[in-house]
Regions:
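Conserved PLP-enzyme active-site core in the AAT-like
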Residues: 17-18, 164-166, 194-360, 364-368, ...
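Flexible inter-domain linker/hinge segments
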Residues: 56-128, 132-140, 145-151, 488
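Conserved phosphate/anionic-ligand binding catalytic regions in large, soluble enzymes, centered on
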Residues: 121-140, 190-196, 334-339, 345, ...
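Conserved small/polar residues in nucleotide/adenosyl-binding loops
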Residues: 480-486
Length: 488
């Protein structure tokens, strides 16, 4: 301000935006010449972000870049009021006893150890959570995320400075194309639900560009993940539920009725394959063909892609777009709620609508739907985990992992079927990647609930399966490739 610049806002946290007018390009080039990255917001504004590692030397370097005569002396004592008074916190914080009970490193260490001993993780037990695909988080996969080359680059760093990341992005996209059979891939979505949102936005734009804005009906089977109808609502689509039959498949006759009833306005069908009921939809290609016949597009929820890798490619049996949970099928650890990555893959006719970004222009097509995530390539620092997994496994290893996952699910179902009913099976009597154990009759006869069984498993050191989902009163079990049948 003392040098004549105006701030875009006097209120800021870690990023300051400066109105630079006709000096913008000169200052931006000054910064590049000194190997300092600042953001060019537009032709008249620049922004600078700070973290805890920035010091007085760096601050003075920035002042020189902005051609300021002033400098900051060591240990400045002045603070600018950078937050409005009505947003300042007045209540107390960190009041819980735990924040005021441990005052030495040893006490803290022992407290953390006590918490760890109460936990059940992969270092103690297999994790059989149905629909979660808890795969091996190998040390070799995880090490690269600790390297500063992956952890420090800013998402908006100039692309010419990110050749290593660009190679990683290219490899992953090519591998995902090969695995899924689709033509286009976007790495931007940050989670499976965000992948759903992105895929449906792509479908919506496809219809809009064809002058069919009326196509806003989204058919969703009753077995779907709860995120499916939520994503459809978020993109402005009307949800119509399709029933499932007694075997857990999409009721094809009910689908016919719904498709014909909404033919003029049919936008999309969201279908999970294999289904959340743990069965392969034998009519999946017929389902896709029917929707296409009535002008709709097919979105495949890729939550269960772990049952397909190396065996079947979604791009070859009907769907137009799907998301890929890298945190499930491709081994990014996601216990405790994150982090996730949900790239989408699509057929050629939808490629031009994939997510783009206003800051990093070439992360997607100029004709795309715009950003669905703050960063152009999502949580790019964890993509190295999936890169390592795919690279080390190779095509044969990936196929074997799928086969073992399906074998394990069927092994468990076979061993339990005489004691606990398996709710859904395919026509050959087998399940896909997971099985649903029906506890309801036991509950009615004895009062023992699925929650009681889960807690008892925990008592014996086993991680509990998924309870009461997708069917209340059941337990869904999914053993991936990391568990031997002897452990099942």
């Amino acid at each position: 301000k003392q040098s004549g610049y105006e701030l875009y806002s006097d209120y800021f946290f870690d990023t300051v935006t400066i109105i630079t007018k006709d000096k913008t390009d000169q200052i931006f080039n000054n910064a590049l010449a000194q190997k300092v990255n600042i953001r060019k917001v537009n032709s008249e504004m620049l922004s600078v972000s700070f973290d805890e590692k920035k010091n007085v030397y760096r601050a003075n370097q920035l002042l020189k870049i902005f051609n300021c005569a002033e400098s900051i002396k060591e240990n400045p004592t002045e603070n600018l009021p950078n937050l409005p008074k009505n947003l300042l916190r007045t209540s107390t914080y960190l009041d819980h006893q735990v924040f005021n009970s441990y005052h030495s490193e040893t006490e803290m260490l022992r407290y953390l150890k006590r918490l760890e001993e109460k936990d059940i993780a992969l270092n103690r037990s297999m994790i059989a959570l149905g629909s979660c695909t808890m795969k091996l988080n190998a040390v070799a996969e995880m090490i690269p995320i600790t390297w500063r080359e992956f952890s420090e680059p800013h998402p908006f760093a100039p692309i010419e400075q990110m050749e290593g990341f660009r190679t990683l992005f290219t490899d992953l996209k090519n591998w995902l194309r090969s695995i899924t059979g689709f033509s286009g891939v976007s790495l931007q979505p940050n989670a499976g639900a965000q992948g759903e949102y992105a895929g449906l936005m792509v479908i919506r734009k496809y219809h809009l560009e064809r002058g069919e804005s009326n196509r806003n009906v989204c058919l969703i089977p009753s077995s779907a993940h709860g995120t499916n109808p939520a994503s459809a609502q978020m993109v402005g689509m009307k949800v119509v539920v399709v029933n499932c039959d007694k075997q857990g498949n999409v009721d094809f006759e009910d689908l016919k009725k719904k498709v014909e009833a909404h033919s003029e306005n049919l936008g999309a069908l969201m279908v999970t394959y294999p289904s959340t009921h743990g069965v392969f939809e034998e009519k999946i290609s017929d389902i896709c063909e029917l929707v296409h016949k009535h002008g709709g597009q097919v979105y495949m929820d890729g939550a269960n892609l772990n049952a397909l890798v190396g065996i079947a490619k979604p791009g070859n049996f009907g769907p137009d777009v799907c998301h890929i949970n890298l945190h499930k099928t491709f081994c990014i650890p996601h216990g405790g709620g994150g982090p996730g990555m949900g790239p989408i893959a699509c057929k050629r006719h939808l490629e031009i609508y994939l997510p783009s970004h206003p800051v990093i222009k070439d992360c997607g097509p100029a004709t795309g739907i715009g950003p669905v995530s703050a960063a152009p390539w999502g949580s790019s620092s964890i993509l190295s985990i999936s890169w390592m997994y795919i690279k080390m496994m190779g095509s044969e290893g990936l196929k074997l992992a799928t086969q073992i996952a399906i074998l394990n699910a069927n092994y468990v179902a076979h061993k339990l079927k005489n004691h606990f009913p398996i709710l859904y099976k395919g026509t050959n009597g087998n399940v896909a990647h997971e099985c649903i154990i029906d506890i309801r009759s036991i509950k009615n006869d004895t009062g023992v609930t699925e929650e009681d069984i889960a807690k008892r498993l925990i008592d014996f050191g086993f991680h509990a399966p998924t309870m009461s989902w997708p069917v209340p009163g059941t337990m869904t079990v999914s053993y991936t490739h990391l568990t031997l049948p002897t452990n099942c």
